[in-house]
Amino acid sequence: MFGSATANPPAQRDLPSSDSDSPTPDAQPPYLLEISHISKGFPGVIALNDVQLRVRPGSVLALMGENGAGKSTLMKIIAGIYQPDSGEIRLRGKPIRFETPLSALQAGIAMIHQELNLMPFMSIAENIWIGREQLNGLHMVDHREMHRCTTELLERLRIRLDPEDLVGNLSIAERQMVEIAKAVSYNSDVLIMDEPTSAITETEVAHLFSIINDLRAQGKGIIYITHKMNEVFEIADEVAVFRDGAYIGLQRAESMDGDSLITMMVGRELTQLFPEREKPPGEVLLSVSNLCLNGIFKDVSFDLRAGEILGIAGLMGSGRTNVAETLFGITPSDSGEVRFDGTTVHIADPHQAIELGFALLTEDRKLTGLFPCLSVMENMEMAVLANYAGNGFVQQKALRALCEDMCKKLRVKTPSLEQCIDTLSGGNQQKALLARWLMTNPRLLILDEPTRGIDVGAKAEIYRLISLLASEGMAVIMISSELPEVLGMSDRVMVMHEGEMMGILDRGEATQEKVMHLASGHKVH
């Protein structure tokens, strides 16, 4: 019965069988979870090589590493999705092996995936208790009891949602909370959170962290996977680092700083994360005057020079992405003027924008960028395919040569151009999408969250490419939610708040405090 899962903790769980004896009742193991000498290989790849990890009760362990470091593989082993080739897992001091994700859940290990696994046309209560529904005396689902238990669970977590709300009507952050509630409903002692803040606002992050603090106080062990170093130092007690399938080390978060963490992750010092550009910007290439999209943003005005990087900062919902989509013709403006290279232009659709020399790398590469079932080459050639086709034939040899050249220039790591792009790391996917647009020879490059969900080493590569393109005379608009990124890369920073342009700061005067002040709706005096 699921009712007891929320009100009173159940009796000691029956763990999957193990050949080893359990610890004595009086012995309290110091760790909730211990990983020892785990190895895992796939055809042609050693994903994990003799790694270790341990999670203390009542603590948050941040798991850091570049994409491909082995973090996800280890978490899938812990959650029962993969089986290790060798090594041992101990839960509460007892050796254990999970054959299925269900056996891991029943033992007290829950994983909240980055790609949320909820049913959009079912209610919150139905999603939380799916497969564990309470039945009444007629052996029918007892919706009243399910509602009661869900209400109690949400109140305990301070999540203000109606159990009867359809999940499909919730925001991403609210769905994240439902996933956490579902994990807690199993009385899980170990919770694995994979990039939980990748698509939520700062206010929602604060709420998430308060819930994590509550879970920590209840003695839960939390494994927190993230690429955001500021979150590590805010929420984590300890930090474990993986690199190239190997365990590098574990340290107290308070004993580390950003530089030492980066060095552990990439195996070298990134002395200059944001490259310097000596060449000054050229003449004005793009001039935007009083651009408006009814109900979304109004009176946006700015100039952009060739070779200049203009950062756009603001909180989620401020209108940053909408401005980019309007410039690219996805949502044509209702009023205002756009001049490109001295000529007034009316951009009605993306095809016209591309012909003018505009390129847009969208905010969500999985939703609006990638064709996940197609190859690297098929994804890269998408924007120029029409230029290499005629009379029913495609110039495959010329396209392949172009794609190979772009892969070399942008350092896209892939076994072959025929490789399914969905198998590449986030950083290499992003570079492949950037290559798609560079093949069109754009003069204006609009980047919306160009480093979202990629590791620090791949970020350095993206920054290098953006800086190189600007040095070659390309005008760049870069939208980002990461203030250090905006401040480190931009020549000027435009700040938006609820559809209004609050101001533009030169590089020398732009600080995190000033940008946040403007982004919150306050003018800088």
Swiss-Prot record:
Top class in the EC scheme: translocase
CDD domains xrefs: ABC_Carb_Monos_I, ABC_Carb_Monos_II
Record's bilayer topology term: Peripheral membrane protein
Keyword Nucleotide-binding (UniProt): yes
Keyword annotations of the record: ATP-binding, Cell inner membrane, Cell membrane, Membrane, Nucleotide-binding, Repeat, Sugar transport, Translocase, Transport
Domain ABC transporter: 33-269, 279-523
Extent of Low complexity compositional bias: 14-25
UniProt GO MF annotations: ABC-type D-ribose transporter activity; ATP binding; ATP hydrolysis activity
Transmembrane helix found in the keyword field: no
UniProt cross-references to Pfam families, sorted A to Z: ABC_tran
Reaction catalysed by this enzyme: D-ribose(out) + ATP + H2O = D-ribose(in) + ADP + phosphate + H(+); D-galactose(out) + ATP + H2O = D-galactose(in) + ADP + phosphate + H(+)
Stored InterPro entries: AAA+_ATPase (IPR003593), ABC_carbohydrate_import_ATPase (IPR050107), ABC_transporter-like_ATP-bd (IPR003439), ABC_transporter-like_CS (IPR017871), P-loop_NTPase (IPR027417)
UniProt-annotated binding residues for ATP: G65, E66, N67, G68, A69, G70, K71, S72
Ranges for region Disordered: 1-30
Domain of life of the native organism: Bacteria
E.C. designation(s): 7.5.2.11, 7.5.2.7
SMART domains named in the record: AAA (SM00382)
Compartment(s) where it occurs, according to its Swiss-Prot or TrEMBL record: Cell inner membrane
PANTHER family: CARBOHYDRATE TRANSPORT ATP-BINDING PROTEIN MG119-RELATED, GALACTOSE_METHYL GALACTOSIDE IMPORT ATP-BINDING PROTEIN MGLA
Designated name of the protein: Putative ribose/galactose/methyl galactoside import ATP-binding protein
